[in-house]
Amino acid sequence: MGIKLINIGFGNIVSANRIVAIVSPESAPIKRVIQEARERGVLIDATYGRRTRAVIVTDSDHIILSAVQPETVAHRLNSKDNSKEIESVVDGE
């Protein structure tokens, strides 16, 4: 069974299959996307009060804020060892 989960910091985990984009929050268009998501009620803030370093866009139009660098999240997304470790936890092994 292949549910791949990605740690986005502070023990928060997101389904890798649902991720559309991982971007930096610095540009004005991304800041607008964050504000619009906040107004629509689809913003998930997983920063624990820390500075937002990555913005994760999902296929359900949810916007997830993470305190982890976008490169780190992308590396975890591409890491095969990480997915096996988390899949073992999900499968109960």
Swiss-Prot record:
It comes from the Bacteria. Coiled coil: none annotated. InterPro entries: RemA-like (IPR007169). Pfam families: RemA-like. Belongs to the RemA family. HAMAP family: RemA. This is Putative regulatory protein Clos_1422. It comes from Alkaliphilus oremlandii (strain OhILAs) (Clostridium oremlandii (strain OhILAs)).
